[in-house]
């Protein structure tokens, strides 16, 4: 009974152990004979049971730890795929730290006689900076993989590197750790020495059937760092090349002691400063680099001090921009560096120009698309030109040439003066003479031949707009005189009068005069008579007498309609001139005078009478007289102001008044008291009617 109870009490022990097993390790326990099942059921009274249980849990823990490298490898792969959110160096440190703790825990369980405190399992932070990260590998961590599998794995990883895929080996650092079989040899080679292996600073430590290789690049490799690789050769096989790995030092830092890998530092060493200058404080590395190159070029050529940084950030004054625009285009297009002519071609005072150029560059270098000497040299050239002009103005020495624009107006806007243009050299004047710019006027201010041709073309174009359409505002003709009554004549006389009127119209339709020059500035030489004649011709060109609807040539009788005096011919009336009025412009008076001068040949030029064909015996002009008896017509003011708007306003007022009267009359019906009263009244009446109908039935 006691033994049975004792066995019954010890049966739940294995179940508890099996409950702690992980499900993915059951198959490995069932298949492998290396780990026998727990013997608590078969040998409950064995004295070596605690030791076996300890070994069992130790091996189980080693199996669990054997899966950690692959898990960390996958984690590193995903971290690199997602932009390096988790730094790989800290993951390596965490892996080594966890493995070291696990190994020390296994040693404590395998040797229970050795007592270690819990504090010994902690990894001091001060020791991490001194102890190498390879010490935990010397404790004998057994990787559950064969040498052939490891070699295939390395080859696969190196092939993945060729396709630029992010793998575990692709870590941007100048140091690393590799686990290789003992049959392989490792060496660091550069991209220049891929054919012959060169032994680099390697640290090889044997660990059973494997070798732990920790490599650290020499500073000498930094001179040709574009490509560094790891080459593994077989000692027996003929040196089969596995592959190489590209290492970029931009995101890592090599410790100066050259012994142990160190974490990244914010500051940089002096050697790294020489190879890669820091970014500009202005935040633009390209501009800083260009400025440094420019200053080095100036220092090498001129031998002066480096100028101070540009304070205006590349902007220059308007005068310097004008100097750039006024440079000789041939020198700028051929060679910008040779924009300044040699000293032999210039006058003697220009020999000191290089020194001035250097001083200007050292004080305020300007950033432009050309070299920095160009604007300064041009400015000095202009200053020297002005100085020579001032000093040699009274002497017969040749004046230094100043680059000017071919267009005089643009050159004047850019700062040139007429005196500078007159004082230009002979070569420059010959250039102006070879290709003169036709501005439309000769030297004497008269019109040139090209301008005359253009005027003829413009006149032809203007005449094309004049049509016979009487309703065209540009073709409206009307005389500036009143119509006169003409005595009846023979058809021949009427024909002559009509031809005379047509002659006047034809003379008015003459070609447009040539417009005088208003921009030449010689207003004092103009004659007023010639100007008036030209203006009169121009005014008459717009007046076409054959168009009765032309506002500029309107004709109307100046006297009221009256009885036609027939059968009377007054010789004095024929000599009377038609009444011509002058408008608000002087041109109208000129027109009227010309028409009055033609009155003898054409006494009746009225278009309306000519078209109607009416003939009158004589022409009589009525005078305005005042009668003593005047007929007055009285019109009521109210009737005069009547209109539709007044009717509408009156109707609106009436409608508003009616609305107000209606509201006063029936507005109380809409009140609540009245409605309630009427409701009660109707309800009582409805009840009475209902009772009356029931009684009647």
Curated annotation (Swiss-Prot):
Consequences of knocking out this gene: Mice are born at the expected Mendelian ratio, but exhibit severe growth retardation and impaired erythropoiesis. None survive the first day of postnatal life. PPP1R15A-PPP1R15B double-knockout embryos do not develop past the preimplantation period.
GO cellular-component term (any): protein phosphatase type 1 complex
Chain spans, region Disordered: 328-354, 417-456, 486-531
Cited Pfam families: CReP_N (PF10472), PP1c_bdg (PF10488)
Biased composition range(s): Basic and acidic residues: 345-354
Record bears the keyword Cytoplasm: no
A molecular function (GO) term: protein phosphatase regulator activity
Gene Ontology biological process terms in this record: ER overload response; regulation of translational initiation; response to endoplasmic reticulum stress; response to hydrogen peroxide; response to oxidative stress
Acidic residues bias: start-end ranges: 423-442, 522-531
Function noted in UniProt: Maintains low levels of EIF2S1 phosphorylation in unstressed cells by promoting its dephosphorylation by PP1.
Protein's UniProt name: Protein phosphatase 1 regulatory subunit 15B
Organism, scientific name: Mus musculus
Protein's gene: Ppp1r15b
